[in-house]
Amino acid sequence: MSRRHAAEKREVLPDAKFGDKVLTKFMNNLMIDGKKSVAERIVYNAFDRVENKIKRAPVEVFHEALDNIKPSVEVRSRRVGGATYQVPVEVRPERREALAIRWLIAAARNRNENTMEERLAGELLDAVQSRGTAVKKREDTHKMAEANKAFSHYRW
């Protein structure tokens, strides 16, 4: 690791339609090849689909879905005397959010619907109901941490 000071965290600007910084981070993660307008269109159209489906504010649904995906613990590899242990550690709040965003996008991309808007809307609706691939990823992460609880004294 570098011995210099850590890079400063840059603040993102809130998105144009809802004024939400987390949503901007989500769009930035969704964006491919710097095409932000495409990412925005996908998110806003997916939000319209969600709103039509369950008649709730889409930003609320988005945040509830993210809360259902955020992991509280994860495992990290630690070498101790020639053996590698999976040590459960608590996840920092910023990383929780980043992981939830990444997992939600990955799960949406792997779905079978035709357009990304449909896939994202479907994954958001599933996540709100604690179903779907992204929520399963979180459950698997928690199970791994639970299974390796015996090694938690190797925490650093």
Swiss-Prot record:
<keyword id="KW-0820">tRNA-binding</keyword>
<dbReference type="InterPro" id="IPR000235">
    <property type="entry name" value="Ribosomal_uS7"/>
</dbReference>
<keyword id="KW-0689">Ribosomal protein</keyword>
<keyword id="KW-0687">Ribonucleoprotein</keyword>
<comment type="subunit">
    <text>Part of the 30S ribosomal subunit. Contacts proteins S9 and S11.</text>
</comment>
<comment type="similarity">
    <text>Belongs to the universal ribosomal protein uS7 family.</text>
</comment>
<dbReference type="InterPro" id="IPR005717">
    <property type="entry name" value="Ribosomal_uS7_bac/org-type"/>
</dbReference>
<dbReference type="InterPro" id="IPR023798">
    <property type="entry name" value="Ribosomal_uS7_dom"/>
</dbReference>
<dbReference type="GO" id="GO:0015935">
    <property type="term" value="C:small ribosomal subunit"/>
</dbReference>
<dbReference type="GO" id="GO:0000049">
    <property type="term" value="F:tRNA binding"/>
</dbReference>
<dbReference type="GO" id="GO:0019843">
    <property type="term" value="F:rRNA binding"/>
</dbReference>
<protein>
    <recommendedName>
        <fullName>Small ribosomal subunit protein uS7</fullName>
    </recommendedName>
</protein>
<dbReference type="InterPro" id="IPR036823">
    <property type="entry name" value="Ribosomal_uS7_dom_sf"/>
</dbReference>
<keyword id="KW-0699">rRNA-binding</keyword>
<comment type="function">
    <text>One of the primary rRNA binding proteins, it binds directly to 16S rRNA where it nucleates assembly of the head domain of the 30S subunit. Is located at the subunit interface close to the decoding center, probably blocks exit of the E-site tRNA.</text>
</comment>
<dbReference type="Pfam" id="PF00177">
    <property type="entry name" value="Ribosomal_S7"/>
</dbReference>
<keyword id="KW-0694">RNA-binding</keyword>
<dbReference type="GO" id="GO:0003735">
    <property type="term" value="F:structural constituent of ribosome"/>
</dbReference>
<dbReference type="GO" id="GO:0006412">
    <property type="term" value="P:translation"/>
</dbReference>
<dbReference type="InterPro" id="IPR020606">
    <property type="entry name" value="Ribosomal_uS7_CS"/>
</dbReference>
